[in-house]
């Protein structure tokens, strides 16, 4: 509801886009001035018409007159013309000047903007407003002044203006300017402007430009990080064109020096369906060898930079191209200045691809190349793949799927690593037939059979070289050391490899319901148990060269999880060996009703591999896997993903996460990651504990602890306090990190403007965690 403003020059709570609706009194007792005007000779042919042929409708509940070209109305006056609606206590329309004078509780709605004041003059031809002590809203901003006049159809000059985003008569902050020029949905220009917090002046500017475009934002971030020292990070985002939005970064770090960056987001193409993102950054680093980790570094130059480009171009509805590339000055620039991105992607990729999609196939051409010589990269220069999607052959019960590709592959090791690069041409084609069917109305059986043929232009000549395989059954025999200058790869010439695969999947479901299973404490309103046993038998025969002779590109990668045993889901083409594996398991699901919906109360999936012949796990049985998710109540959840060597030798992994919100203002979380005796990863027993307490409407506190028990190290501590400042949200926190014996300390202080979160002062003492 829009509250009536007080007559003094204060800000009033306003709503954006409120529809113009006649007051109840107008609807109860309408007296139409339009009807009276129709009886005069000047308007005998119809309604009042403006030069633009827009009729004016004036209604009120009081006296209405029309004399000498002046139409007057009193009490609950409502005027409607085009996209403009005007409400007041008194109104007078001059048919010669085409102006409406309104007085008393004036409200002018035009498009989605609202103007509120005591008196105003509105020109129906130019749509200009002249007023004193008027207030207006341009979401999320509020503007007022002692005098407002139009300087164009969508632009206004405000004298002695005030500007804020705080929706209250007494804003906690505002800008007061001698003059304010407002250009609707575009920008605002202030002259001789002072920034106030409450009634206290804080800062003065002779001139301020403020965009109303959602692409505009700014932040000033005093920052501290152990490796930076006291710093000032600033960034301004602004629209360059309607399709291009830019961001300029100007930073200074006392231990590092000045830095500059530019970023751009571009929308283009049909319906703006294509886009591009550019990121650039350069710093003249005064201390490039500063290292707050325990990992030693080599020589790093002082001129450090990153240039990144992401792009997706939609040429047609079924043809598109993707570009993703990053050029870095050194291997540590992302770790030092873009810690948020570094934690997600420490080794940026460089790929260009073009794809043609179809309901039956996808044709993709990929070029993957190395632009940073200090990183290892498997290049594809290029690779072209035709992927045939599973579909029925000639409309029958048998389905076909396959993929065929050719690739020029190069494995390039990091410069200075001591390893020797290698390459080959690979032609690979895979074809498979599938016969899904349901028997007895409940048993799903899906047999499959396929073959793969692969050509390699280069192989490894093992000769008389002996390699000692690992005695760990979880390490494949064909994993050989990477080539070095002392032990280079001997060319074994070209070769062909044939792979035949067959298998069958089967599953069925059973269910039972218990309507009398009722428990408010456990969140039960009836219970349904669904059990689904499943099995997957996979047989693969490989004939051709010894798998050790195959040069590795799409290769075996260490993982704690079971690998796919089906094609084409198994993508490590160069690590294919013969295997016979039977995967068997059961899914249990308990469902209940909640808010008239069926929800999962408990899910448990249990499975194990029987390894008749498995090159990736030479034990008779894999670990026993259990995936549990228990959600007894909307505010409580337990997730446990575990694998245990229950049937044979192996390793142990248990990941546990508990989240509860017992009352509305308290949330607790406990996580534990346990890993033991895996041959590829270090043992770990990591505890992560977090809590948040909302003290009241204005205060909140949070804490998070991360402890690695195997090395008895408290790796990270975070403590924070949150304060709601009505129109701002402030947070104060402390951070302590142990980077392998080298500790970092920081304090975090941020202010976020609730009405427009992109604007604010960011006192950010942990910039890495916020993505800077």
Regions found by a protein language model. Give the residues of each.
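N-terminal start and proteolytic maturation junction detector
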Residues: 12-13, 41
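Ala/Thr-enriched low-complexity intrinsically disordered regions
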Residues: 19-20, 40-44
């Amino acid at each position: 509801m829009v509250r009536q403003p007080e007559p003094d020059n204060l800000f009033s709570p306003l709503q954006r886009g409120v529809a113009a609706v006649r007051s109840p009194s107008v609807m109860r007792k309408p007296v139409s001035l339009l009807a009276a005007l129709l009886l005069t000779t000047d308007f005998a042919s119809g309604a009042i018409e403006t030069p633009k042929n827009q009729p004016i409708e004036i209604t009120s509940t009081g006296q209405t007159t029309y004399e000498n070209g002046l139409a007057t109305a009193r009490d609950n006056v409502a005027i409607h013309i085009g996209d403009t609606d005007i409400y007041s206590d008194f109104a007078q329309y001059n048919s010669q000047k085409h102006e409406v004078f309104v007085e008393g509780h004036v409200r002018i709605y035009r498009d989605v903007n609202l103007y509120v004041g005591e008196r105003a003059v509105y020109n129906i031809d130019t749509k200009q407003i002249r007023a004193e002590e008027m207030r207006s809203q341009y979401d999320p901003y509020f503007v007022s002044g002692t005098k407002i006049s139009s300087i164009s159809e969508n632009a206004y000059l405000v004298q002695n203006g005030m500007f804020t985003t705080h929706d209250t008569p007494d804003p906690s902050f505002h800008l007061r300017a001698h003059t304010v020029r407002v250009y609707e949905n575009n920008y605002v220009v202030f002259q001789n402007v002072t920034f106030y917090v409450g009634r206290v002046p804080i800062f003065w500017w002779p001139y301020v430009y403020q965009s109303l475009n959602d692409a505009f934002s700014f932040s000033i971030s005093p920052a501290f990080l152990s490796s930076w020292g006291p710093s000032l990070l600033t960034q301004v985002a602004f629209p360059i064109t309607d399709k291009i939005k830019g961001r300029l970064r100007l930073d200074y770090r006392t231990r590092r020096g000045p830095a500059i960056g530019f970023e751009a987001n571009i929308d283009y193409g049909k319906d703006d369906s294509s886009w591009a993102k550019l990121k650039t950054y350069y710093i003249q680093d005064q201390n490039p060898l500063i290292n707050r980790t325990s990992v030693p570094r080599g020589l790093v130059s002082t001129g450090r930079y990153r240039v990144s480009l992401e792009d997706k171009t939609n040429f047609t509805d079924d043809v598109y191209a993707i570009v993703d590339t990053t050029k870095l000055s050194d291997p540590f620039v992302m770790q030092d200045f873009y810690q948020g991105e570094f934690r997600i992607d420490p080794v940026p990729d460089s790929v260009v691809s073009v794809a043609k999609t179809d309901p039956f196939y996808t044709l993709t051409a990929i070029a993957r190349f190395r632009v940073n010589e200090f990183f290892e990269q498997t290049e594809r220069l290029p690779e072209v793949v035709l992927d045939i999607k599973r579909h029925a052959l000639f409309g029958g019960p048998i389905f076909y799927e396959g993929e065929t590709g050719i690739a020029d592959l190069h494995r390039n090791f990091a410069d200075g690593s001591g390893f020797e690069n290698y390459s080959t041409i690979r032609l690979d084609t895979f074809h498979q037939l599938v016969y899904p069917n349901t028997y007895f109305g409940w048993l799903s059986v899906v047999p499959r059979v396929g073959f793969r043929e692969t050509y390699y232009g280069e192989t490894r000549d093992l000769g008389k070289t002996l390699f000692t395989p690992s005695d760990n059954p979880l390490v494949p025999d064909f994993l050989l050391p990477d080539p070095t200058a002392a032990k280079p790869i001997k060319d074994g010439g070209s070769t062909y490899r044939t792979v035949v695969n067959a298998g069958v999947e089967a599953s069925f479901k059973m269910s039972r319901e218990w309507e009398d299973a009722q428990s408010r404490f456990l969140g039960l309103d009836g219970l349904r148990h669904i059990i689904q046993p499943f099995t997957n038998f996979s047989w693969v025969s490989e004939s051709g060269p010894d798998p050790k002779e195959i040069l590795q590109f799409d290769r075996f990668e260490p993982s704690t999880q079971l690998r796919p045993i089906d094609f084409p889901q198994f993508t490590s083409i160069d690590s294919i060996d013969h295997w016979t594996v039977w995967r068997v398991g059961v899914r249990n699901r308990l469902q209940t009703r909640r808010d008239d919906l069926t929800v999962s109360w408990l899910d448990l999936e249990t499975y194990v591999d029987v390894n008749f012949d498995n090159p990736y796990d030479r034990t008779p049985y894999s670990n026993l896997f259990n995936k549990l998710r228990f959600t007894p109540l909307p505010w409580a959840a337990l997730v446990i993903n575990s694998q245990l060597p229950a049937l044979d030798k192996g390793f142990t992994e248990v990941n546990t996460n508990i989240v509860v919100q017992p009352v509305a203002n308290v949330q607790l979380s406990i996580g534990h990651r346990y890993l033991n005796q895996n041959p590829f990863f270090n043992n770990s027993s990591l505890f992560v504990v977090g809590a948040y307490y909302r003290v009241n409407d204005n205060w909140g506190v949070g804490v998070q602890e991360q402890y690695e028990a195997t090395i008895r190290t408290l790796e990270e501590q975070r403590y924070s306090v949150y304060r709601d400042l009505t129109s701002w949200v402030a947070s104060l926190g402390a951070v302590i990190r142990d980077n392998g014996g080298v500790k970092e300390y920081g304090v975090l202080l941020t202010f976020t403007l609730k009405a427009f979160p992109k604007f604010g002062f960011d006192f950010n003492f942990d910039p890495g965690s916020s993505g800077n």
